[in-house]
UniProtKB/Swiss-Prot annotation:
Residues 170-191 are annotated as: Disordered. Belongs to the ATPase B chain family. InterPro entries: ATP_synth_B-like_membr_sf, ATP_synth_b/b'su_bac/chlpt, ATP_synth_F0_bsu_bac, ATP_synthase_B_chain. Pfam families: ATP-synt_B. One of its GO terms (molecular function) is proton-transporting ATP synthase activity, rotational mechanism. This is ATP synthase subunit b. Keywords: ATP synthesis, Cell membrane, CF(0), Hydrogen ion transport, Ion transport, Membrane, Transmembrane, Transmembrane helix, Transport. Its main location: membrane. F(1)F(0) ATP synthase produces ATP from ADP in the presence of a proton or sodium gradient. F-type ATPases consist of two structural domains, F(1) containing the extramembraneous catalytic core and F(0) containing the membrane proton channel, linked together by a central stalk and a peripheral stalk. During catalysis, ATP synthesis in the catalytic domain of F(1) is coupled via a rotary mechanism of the central stalk subunits to proton translocation. Gene3D superfamilies: F1F0 ATP synthase subunit B, membrane domain (1.20.5.620). The gene is atpF. It is found in: Cell membrane. F-type ATPases have 2 components, F(1) - the catalytic core - and F(0) - the membrane proton channel. F(1) has five subunits: alpha(3), beta(3), gamma(1), delta(1), epsilon(1). F(0) has three main subunits: a(1), b(2) and c(10-14). The alpha and beta chains form an alternating ring which encloses part of the gamma chain. F(1) is attached to F(0) by a central stalk formed by the gamma and epsilon chains, while a peripheral stalk is formed by the delta and b chains. It is a single-pass membrane protein.
């Protein structure tokens, strides 16, 4: 191995060391004078941008929370209003149902009364027709039995009325089996 010289030692400055030092200091000066302030300015701008974005995000979050609270309050108010509307509609529906039931009941009562009146009128016509028929049959039968003419109208009327009164009296005392319907005695119209 050859002997080492002082020039081989890297710790010992060589002839270019002064030039290297001057270039290094010049680069350091340029960096310190132009590049570092530029980088610091850009870092400060970036820092300011991040800070403003953070504040804006915080403000937006606060506004969103306030809007959410307002939304919840409005939603609660809308739900309460919907409940009131539903209850009012239910009450109105119940009232309408009650009115319709009452109207239907009145209409049914009116129809029943009209039917009863019609039945009474039909019954009265039937009773009158039966009385007339029974009267003429009774007069004819009585004429045959007695063997004399009962042409006198006044006399016929008295006989028929007496005969019908006796029939009605018997019917009231002993209701016939055909007069019982569903366990209840039918009403007899006596006129």
């Amino acid at each position: 191995m050859p002997p080492r010289t002082l020039a081989d030692n890297f710790l010992v400055p060589g002839p270019t060391a002064i030039a290297e030092l001057i270039v290094f200091l010049l680069i350091l000066f340029i960096f310190g004078k132009y590049i570092v302030p530029f980088v610091n300015q850009k870092l400060a701008e970036r820092q300011e941008l991040i800070r403003s974005q953070f504040e804006e995000a915080k403000r937006a979050r606060d506004e969103a929370e306030a809007a959410a609270a307002e939304y919840r309050a409005q939603l609660q108010e809308i739900r309460a209003e919907a409940t009131r509307v539903r209850e009012r509609a239910h009450e109105e529906g119940q009232q309408i149902i009650a009115e319709m039931k009452e109207q239907a009941r009145r209409e049914a009562d009116r129809i029943v009364r009209a039917a009863e009146e019609q039945i009474q009128a039909e019954r009265a016509r039937a009773v009158a027709a039966v009385r007339a028929e029974v009267g003429s049959l009774a007069v004819e039968l009585a004429s045959r039995i007695v063997g004399e003419s009962l042409a006198d109208v006044e006399r016929q009327h008295r006989i028929v009325e007496r005969f019908l009164a006796e029939l009605e009296e018997r019917a009231q005392r002993q209701p016939a089996a055909s007069d019982v319907v569903g366990g209840q005695q039918r009403e007899e119209v006596h006129r």
